[in-house]
UniProtKB/Swiss-Prot annotation:
Organism: Nocardioides sp. (strain ATCC BAA-499 / JS614)
Family assignment from sequence similarity: Belongs to the CsrA/RsmA family.
Pfam families xref list: CsrA
Keyword Repressor: yes
Gene: csrA
GO biological process, one term: negative regulation of translational initiation
Function: A translational regulator that binds mRNA to regulate translation initiation and/or mRNA stability. Usually binds in the 5'-UTR at or near the Shine-Dalgarno sequence preventing ribosome-binding, thus repressing translation. Its main target seems to be the major flagellin gene, while its function is anatagonized by FliW.
Name of the molecule in the record: Translational regulator CsrA
One GO CC annotation: cytosol
PANTHER family noted in UniProt: CARBON STORAGE REGULATOR
Chief location of this protein within or outside the cell: cytoplasm
Gene3D superfamilies to which the protein is assigned, alphabetical: Translational regulator CsrA
Assembly mode: Homodimer; the beta-strands of each monomer intercalate to form a hydrophobic core, while the alpha-helices form wings that extend away from the core.
The entry's keywords: Bacterial flagellum biogenesis, Cytoplasm, Repressor, RNA-binding, Translation regulation
Localization terms from the record: Cytoplasm
């Protein structure tokens, strides 16, 4: 990991078209501005981790959902519109 020291108003250039600027430093909070093309996805790491966990949970149905589906299939109570 590259570690840099920057003051408010100073920037770092990533690649050819991403500029990260330190806007303000107040105590232990740093405001950062990111200038990047729309094609570059920029996410806060904690929100990305939360989104990944939510997606993982959504992709894994609960045992109750699976059991209810199995019962419906066994009893022929599906939602087939032709029945």
């Amino acid at each position: 990991m590259l570690v840099l020291s920057r003051r408010a108003g100073e920037s770092v250039v990533l690649g050819e078209d991403v500029v990260v600027t330190i806007l303000e430093v107040r105590g232990d909070v740093v405001r950062v501005g990111i200038d990047a093309p729309r094609s570059v996805r920029v996410h806060r790491a904690e929100l990305l981790a939360q989104l990944e966990e939510t997606n993982r949970q959504a992709a894994s149905p609960s045992e109750d959902v699976i059991a209810n589906l199995a019962r419906a299939l066994d009893h022929g109570t599906g939602t087939d519109p032709s029945s």
